[in-house]
Amino acid sequence: MAAGRVAEMGAKVILIEKNESLGKKLLITGGGRCNLTNAEFDTRKFLEKFKGDGKFLFSTFSQFGVKETLEFFHKLGVETKVENEQRVFPASDSSKTVLDALLKYIKKQKVEIILNSPVTDILTSKNDKQKISGVRLKNRKEILARKVIIATGGTSRPETGSTGDGFGWLRKIGHTIIEPTPSLVPIAIKDAWIKKLAGLSLANIKITTFQNNVKQESGKGKIIFTHFGLSGPAILNMSKDIGELLKYGEVIISLDLFPSEDHGMLNTKIQELFKKQNNKKFKNSLNTLTPSALASEIVKISKINPETQCNSVTREERLALVNILKNIPIRADKLLGEEKAIISSGGVSLDEVDFKTMSSRLFPNLYLIGDILNIDRPSGGYSLQLCWTTGFVAGNSTKMEK
């Protein structure tokens, strides 16, 4: 995005890539489908998802937001569709569609691409210590430039080449780097029964975390059971907070399977269900409420005799079942780490970036974009939109900044 925009305005651009090909990380986004953005067109509402960091980004998104991003990709021939929670995907359901469009864009603008070329250092000018003069490659070759844009990403999914290289270069020249940690990462669970449900996904689940019986955070959305524990948007969005809590002791993750119904409403629902089931055994009665694999585990957790007929379940047992459906306690073990994280937290301190241009406040001809910035955001298209927005604004600003 940034390279293409700079070249589009007439500058000579060299795009340096450490890998043997461009776009390795883009190809795995959204499970290989590429969650391009989120179709929230109100900038203020969009940036609320970035919590406290949103205030830094308003001037950036005012220049190039969701609307402009979709127009950009549509002009490149990428058809899109909107799915649950306003997530935008290419109609092809393939990240390759997006990558191919971007490659076509930069090639049309005659961007020079240098592959297999790891950078080791950012060069500062000998005559002006507040000016960047270029970069040094691993082979010791120096590439000089009037403007340098750093888009190396964070430390998540290192197999794609995202190993935090840029943090080291920027530290050397005086930038403050907040230590990166995995963010939007699946969670390993201690309870063995969870792993029996691997592959099962549930929508609209309320998640609440507890530590020492004290409520911590809540969220709602889709969860996915895996062979190691829990994933899915709702879990990923709370993973950073869960990771912090785990430093201080055990964390309980409570699942409310029916967040839109209070205990009384759910009790009535189960009463009616048991009346209909009547002589049916309890162990076979919950399949209409939840997927059968989960229903079997709930039967075990409830401690109600599975052979009991529904019309013989006592009031106390039924109320206890309601409590379970509204509060399934699960013991968190650990976050899975950078190799499974979608993004990383940490990065360049935001006070050292001019968000009107994405330029460094220490070096006005150095631009910092995307995941290299210390900006937390949820899953759902927000990470890629941050990249598109900061990339375009940085590219645009190289023309404005002399």
Language-model regions, residue ranges each:
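N-terminal Rossmann-like FAD-binding beta1-loop-alpha1 element of flavoenzymes
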Residues: M1-L15, W388, A394-K399
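A conserved beta-strand/loop element that lines the FAD pocket in flavoprotein oxidoreductases
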Residues: I106-T120, P180
